[in-house]
């Protein structure tokens, strides 16, 4: 399975090498704008596990960038970490509405599904990540581990 993915990607890269090397950096976001100071502040707060304060900054960031899937993903993450699953579900859905292939939102939404004991839905997100991440990605690996942990009775660390 991995060989086929590797082969397909290799052929694609060879055929489109001029386009690939001029494409620039990749991001989960569909937004090429520079990240706002409010967004950057929110990231720092999230890293410090100050989720309520991060939500305030993320809402500030939405004022000027309401179509940024990364902002909605972090809003979902912050609400999930605060135990506000309905709010988290809304924000993950919004992130995926903007960018259906947002790896972070698919992973974190999958983690939320596991918290809600909806293993089947988490596995659906894992399948989506498997299709998006041709040669694998950390989001796939983390969600897969969390699903395995959930099935064996362990608590996820994500």
Language-model segments: residues:
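Terminal, low-structured helical/coil segments at or just beyond the last alpha-helical repeat
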Residues: 24-35, 123-158
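Alpha-helical segment of the N-proximal tetratricopeptide repeat
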Residues: 33-64
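Structural marker of alpha-solenoid helical repeat scaffolds
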Residues: 64, 98, 131-135
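Residue-level recognition of tetratricopeptide repeat
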Residues: 68, 102, 136-137
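Canonical tetratricopeptide repeat
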Residues: 74, 108, 142-146
């Amino acid at each position: 399975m991995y060989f086929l993915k590797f082969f397909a990607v290799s052929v694609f890269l060879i055929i489109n090498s001029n386009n690939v090397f001029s494409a620039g950096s990749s991001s989960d976001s569909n937004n090429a704008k520079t990240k706002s100071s409010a967004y950057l502040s929110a990231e720092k707060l999230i890293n410090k596990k100050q989720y309520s304060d991060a939500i305030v900054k993320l809402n500030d960031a939405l004022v000027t960038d309401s179509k940024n899937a990364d902002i909605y993903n972090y809003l979902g993450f912050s609400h999930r970490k605060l135990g506000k699953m309905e709010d988290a579900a809304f924000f993950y859905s919004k992130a995926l509405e903007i960018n259906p292939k947002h790896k972070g939102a698919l992973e974190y939404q999958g983690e939320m599904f596991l918290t809600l004991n909806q293993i089947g839905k988490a596995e659906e997100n894992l399948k989506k990540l498997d299709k998006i991440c041709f040669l694998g990605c950390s989001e796939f690996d983390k969600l897969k581990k969390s699903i395995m942990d959930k099935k064996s009775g362990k608590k996820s660390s994500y």
